[in-house]
Curated annotation (Swiss-Prot):
This is Phytanoyl-CoA dioxygenase, peroxisomal. The lineage of its organism: Eukaryota, Metazoa, Chordata, Craniata, Vertebrata. Pathway: Lipid metabolism; fatty acid metabolism. GO terms for cellular component: 9+0 non-motile cilium; mitochondrion; peroxisomal matrix; peroxisome. Residues 1-30 form a transit peptide. It comes from the Eukaryota. Fe cation binds at residues 175, 177, 264. GO terms for biological process: 2-oxobutyrate catabolic process; 2-oxoglutarate metabolic process; fatty acid alpha-oxidation; isoprenoid metabolic process; methyl-branched fatty acid metabolic process.
């Protein structure tokens, strides 16, 4: 599908929107676990009943807002994702709709088609090879524990965190992913984030604030960092700096599933290599879109719409909800609302 076809699809979508619409499992605990005898199923708020998660795993996610599944994605799949990423960076393939991003510290350098010039690609829903990640049965098996059976792939990314050149721009500020989405309820949304290599504090692993998914969506904006901030890297403006933090050390193929209200970020990449991970946000198609006007999400909504209008050549006809529905893809079950 080329951009012309994408534009045509968007026009059809906008018209539609104008009408009413009906492996080994290891969880690393960071807080005490309730015993099965003292924890009743009706207390579950963030996980759904099925035979995939153990009681201990459900309790862990309920308490902490994330769950690490070891060795979930195969080496073969990860190598295929890496190879496709490199082809995209070399401009050997140009999937329609894909967004290629560069670190702000590299933005002034002359661009040469190479994976060393790209910090992230996103919106790869039209790239058959990368989108396979969002269709992997081993991923969807766990996603369904949080979203239910009707599953939409909302947003795919492959992150290529570059070595930090001293400006600390490879950091990702602490944030909540729900800031970027107009979908509710938040409990039916989950991110799957898979390490494509060994990841630790040296190359900028994820850091999470356990239990913060139980709070509310906080105001976000660009942090005032001296070295600059990457495009759309909004951060929380008000959080408790004394909150306990957990750094997720992960091996290739390990996958963390986390709630969209969980506060998380990542540190600098202090190595000479590029730290790679692939992720997708999933949501239940039973979710509803909300109007973010007058909320703390207005700032990101403006940015997203401006980028989409520039990309597709539509001025004044799109809103925040349209941009997300346009990119979302059904991966399991039935498409209901979004």
């Amino acid at each position: 599908m080329n951009l012309t076809r994408a534009g045509a699809r968007l026009q059809v979508l906008l018209g539609h929107l104008g009408r009413p619409s009906a492996p080994t499992i290891v969880a690393q605990p960071v807080s005490g676990l309730a015993s099965p005898a003292s924890f009743q199923p009706e207390q579950f708020q963030y996980t759904l009943d099925n035979n995939v998660l153990t009681l201990e795993q459900r309790k862990f996610y309920e308490e902490n807002g994330f769950l690490v599944i070891k060795n979930l994605v195969s080496d073969d799949d990860i190598q295929r994702f890496r190879a496709e990423f490199e082809r995209i960076c070399r401009e050997e393939v140009k999937p329609p709709g894909i967004v290629i991003m560069r670190d702000v510290a590299l933005a002034k350098q002359d661009y040469m088609p190479s994976d060393r010039m790209v910090s992230k690609i996103q919106d790869f829903q039209e790239d058959e090879e990368l989108f396979r990640y969002c269709l992997l049965p081993e991923i969807l098996k766990y996603v369904e524990c949080f979203t239910g059976p009707n599953i939409m792939a909302l947003h795919g990314m492959l992150i290529n965190k570059p070595p930090d050149v001293g400006k600390k721009t490879s950091r990702h500020p602490l944030h909540q992913d729900l800031h970027y989405f107009p979908f509710r309820p938040s409990n039916l949304i989950v991110c799957a984030w898979t390490a494509m290599e060994h990841i630790d504090r040296n190359n900028g692993c994820l850091v999470v604030l356990p239990g913060t998914h139980k709070g509310t969506l906080k105001p976000h904006d660009y942090p005032k960092w001296e070295g600059g901030v990457n495009k759309m890297y909004h951060g929380i403006q008000d959080y408790d700096p004394n909150s306990p933090r957990v750094h997720l050390v992960m091996e290739k193929g390990d996958t963390v599933f986390f709630h969209p209200l969980l506060i998380h970020g990542s540190g600098r990449n202090k190595t000479q290599g590029f730290r790679k991970a692939i992720s997708c946000h999933f949501g239940s198609s039973d979710c509803q879109c909300i109007d973010v006007s007058g909320t703390s999400q207005e700032n990101i909504a403006r940015e997203v719409v401006e980028m989409a209008e520039k990309k597709y050549g539509f001025q004044g006809v799109m809103d925040f909800k349209d941009t997300w529905i346009f990119r979302s893809r059904l991966v399991k079950g039935e498409r209901i609302n979004i």
